[in-house]
């Protein structure tokens, strides 16, 4: 049985209205994309670290908050466990990642990628489509496993939804594409 939405009705919701402007692409995202490109060895015109730090600073500027330099210097803070005040037995979660904020030049390429994508996720809030695309592509940032996976085993609880299922008409009329896509998913 899933968690009932009414259980959390006293919590806040994003403060957006239909008439509000919605961000589609921000400067911080550009910096994080360049950081990832530099990390992969592409000529981005700078280092992964420089673009990563620029992305964090641009995100702070966009939100009109101070403290970016102090934030970037924090080599101690790691993701905290989530303690659900309403349903702790079912919804508490302790992150597996120990990623910090401060850039660590000695870290593995994978850890650096996790750091970049995690900060990109934060900077892009509330653009869920960007976060979902990055998560599908990289597996970062670490997200809570599904509390109520009602897919009958079709969707992995920890890996979660990676792509939308093909409609029946596509399965019946274009099976070659379907098998190619399934093979690509299994290779990831």
Show the residue positions of the predicted features:
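Structural helix-adjacent loops and short alpha-helical linkers that scaffold large soluble proteins
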Residues: 42-48
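Aromatic-residue-lined binding/catalytic grooves and analogous aromatic/hydrophobic interfacial grooves
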Residues: 1-6, 43, 144-175
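Single conserved hydrophobic/aromatic residue that forms the stacking wall/gate
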Residues: 179-188
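Short basic/hydrophobic patches in alpha-helices and adjacent helix-turn junctions
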Residues: 36, 118-124, 137, 141
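C-terminal structural cap/anchor segments
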Residues: 48-131
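C-terminal/domain-terminus segments
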Residues: 130-150
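Flexible, polar/acidic helix-loop-strand segments at domain edges
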Residues: 1-26, 33-39, 50, 54-57, ...
């Amino acid at each position: 049985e899933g968690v009932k939405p009414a259980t959390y009705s006293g919590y806040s919701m994003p403060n957006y209205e239909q008439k509000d402007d919605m961000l589609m692409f921000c400067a911080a995202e550009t910096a994080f994309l360049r950081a990832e490109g530099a990390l992969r060895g592409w000529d981005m015109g700078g280092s992964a670290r420089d673009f990563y730090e620029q992305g964090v600073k641009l995100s702070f500027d966009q939100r009109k908050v101070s403290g970016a330099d102090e934030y970037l210097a924090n080599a101690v803070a790691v993701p905290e466990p989530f303690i659900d005040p309403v349903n702790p037995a079912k919804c508490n979660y302790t992150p597996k990642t120990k990623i910090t904020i401060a850039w660590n030049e000695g870290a593995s390429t994978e850890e650096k990628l996790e750091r970049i994508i995690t900060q990109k996720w934060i900077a892009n809030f509330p653009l869920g489509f960007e976060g979902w695309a990055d998560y599908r592509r990289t597996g970062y940032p670490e997200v809570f496993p599904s509390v109520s996976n009602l897919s009958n085993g079709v969707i992995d609880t920890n890996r979660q939804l990676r792509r939308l299922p093909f409609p029946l008409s596509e399965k019946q009329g274009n099976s070659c594409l379907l098998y190619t896509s399934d093979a690509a998913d299994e290779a990831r």
